[in-house]
Amino acid sequence: MQFSAMTMNMFVPGNDDPGDDNRIIDMALAQSIWLAELGYHVWFTDHHFRGPWHSNPMQFAAYVAPLIPRDRYMGFGVLSIPFYHPVRLVESMNLLDQLTKGKVLFGVGSGWQGTEPNGLGVDPEAHASGRLAEETLDVMERLWGFKYGDPECSFSVGSHSGRIKRRIMPAPYSRPYPTIIRVATREAGIVRAAQKGWPVFVGVLGADLREQMQLYRRALDETNHPQDVKDNCLRWCSYDWVGVTVAATDEEALEREKLARAETMAIRGSFIQRHGKMDGPVMKATPGQSTADAYAKGGDMKATIAGTPDTIAAKVKQLADMGINHLHLRFLGEWDGETRHICKTSAELFAKEVLPRFAEAQPSRPPAMAAAH
C-alpha cells in the first residue's frame, strides 16, 4: 500500500501579514522534506488567495523534488485545471514529469467555487457544474496526442483558446502523458476514468467507498487496457480526505483529535470573520446549504480515524481489504499553531508503527503510464 501526506493540510493563514509569507513558505518546505524522510509521498494543494505557497504548487514541487528521497512521489490534490491555460498547464506538467522521471501524481479536478474562479476570471456557473474541468481535460489529451504532421489543433475552453501547429515541448517522461488521478464523485465520472486508464479518488467527502471501489473495478475489468495500465490504476486509486490522529491510547487519540479540530475551526472562523465566506471542498450537506456554509461548519472533516497504532492499522487493513492501495492522509493539527505536536506525533507514530505493516517493494523506476485511446 502507498501512503501520501498533505503538506500543511488545508492551511488557512492565522494572520494575513505579507511579511509572514516567507516564514510560512519555509515552514511548508521543511514539513514537506520531513514527511518524505518519514516515508510518505508528499502532496500539495492548489489554491488562491488563502496561502502563500499553494498558489503555484508545481513551482513549489519543482523546488522540493531534489530535496527528498528519490523513491518518493509528489502529488497534487488537486490541480484546479479550469484555472489554467491548457497549453501552459500541459507544458508545466510535462516538465515536472521529466525532471522527476515520472514521480509526480497529478490529481485533477474543478477546484473550489467562490473567490477562486471569480478572481481568475472563470465563469462561476460553468465552473461549478464541472463542465469546464471535463472540457479542459479533453483539450489536454488532444495536446498530449498532437504530433508533427497532424492538422492544426485549435481549441476554445472557458476564457482560454489557442491554435497550435507544433507539438508541446517538452514531451512527458511518462507515456502517453503524466500520471493523472481524477476526482470523480459521480458514477459516470468513475466509469469514464476507468475507460481512460486513470486512477481515481474514491470515497471523496463521504461518498460510499465500497460501492465506488466496486464500480471502478468492474469498469476497469471491462476495458481492453494492458495489464500494466490496470495495475497502475489500482496502485494509485486513492482514498482521499482521511484525517488521522495517532496516540499511545485510543482515548488520548480521540481527545487530541478534538483539540486539533477545534483549533482548525477557530482559525477558519477567524479568517471567515475577517475576509468573508470561504468556499471549500465539501458537498452540500443539506438541501439549500452552500459549500461555504458547510465548510464553515467543518464539513470537510467527516472522514477521520483516531487511535493507537494497532487501532489505526486495523482500520487501514479494512481499507486494504476493499482494494484501496493508496491512502491520502491528513494528520490533524495546525503546523503553525498550538496543535502542531498532535500532527507531528501522529505522523511519526504512523510512519514507525503502521506504515511498515503495509510496505510494498518500490520499483526502481515508475511504470510508464499508458492508456488506450
Model-derived regions: residue spans:
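Flexible, glycine-rich active-site loops centered on histidine and acidic residues
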Residues: 1-21, 82-155, 199-208, 258
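N-terminal beta1-alpha1-beta2 module of alpha/beta enzyme domains
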Residues: 1-76, 177, 368-373
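Conserved, mostly hydrophobic/aromatic
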Residues: 3, 35, 47, 64, ...
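Hydrophobic faces of well-ordered beta-strands that scaffold small-molecule active sites
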Residues: 3-7, 42-45, 72-77, 104-108, ...
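An alpha-helical appendage that flanks or caps ligand/catalytic pockets
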Residues: 5-7, 126-169, 209-325, 359-373
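Active-site mouth loops of central-metabolism enzymes
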Residues: 9-26, 77-87, 174-185, 244-247, ...
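Glycine-rich, proline-tolerant flexible connector loops at the mouths of alpha/beta enzymes
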Residues: 42-63, 80, 204-206, 330-344
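Alpha-helix-loop-beta-strand connector modules within alpha/beta enzyme cores
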Residues: 54-76, 132, 344-364
